[in-house]
Amino acid sequence: HAFAADPSRGLFILIFLCIVIGLSFALFAWKAPEVASGGNFAIVSRESMLLVNNIFLVVAMSAGLLGTLYPLILDALGLGKISVGAPYFDAVFAPLMLPVIFLMAIGPLVRWKEAELGSLVRQMVPSFIVSLIAAVAIPFAMGEFKIWPAVGFFLAFWVFCSIIHEIRVGSRNAKTVSSGFLRHGRSWWGMQLAHLGIGVTVFGIAMVMGYEAERDVRMVPGDV
């Protein structure tokens, strides 16, 4: 949108992205020899969760890139002009993000290398029940049940409950509430804050997608 509205602003953003991404890849390449091998890991492990998560993200990125560049490629080859809009991205991107968000809530609870599936399921049962109740109750409270907003509410509360569960487990056996909170480092709290932001975003998308109301009305001076 910035490129289309203001080419000079778009150039600035392009340069900024090149600097940020270029430096990130340069730092990664510089530190690559120091990264130790991950070794073997079981199917039910945090490594597997991260691997599946990254696969979905790469596929979603590729789908978005295809939808963005495909019209330009057709135009450059003289094969006609087409427009790829919101319906394509909604149909392709949303299904890929659903498993990512679902696994995002589970991943931090899974042990590295190998985890016990039964123990993991038992931990997530309360979160699943609360999320399912929220997915049913909120649409009915809004006056109409819609399946896709309900799925969004389920995933949002799935993330919220996972965060609460992690904080509760991490603060277990602490002498005071404050000591339980301070036992975690900044990186751990950063992860929780990032997950909370995604949960809030999903909740907002679900609410807008299903229950947004927009009206055009005529107003004159003095109307309130």
Where are these regions (language model features)?
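Contiguous transmembrane helix-bundle modules in multi-pass membrane proteins
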Residues: 1-224
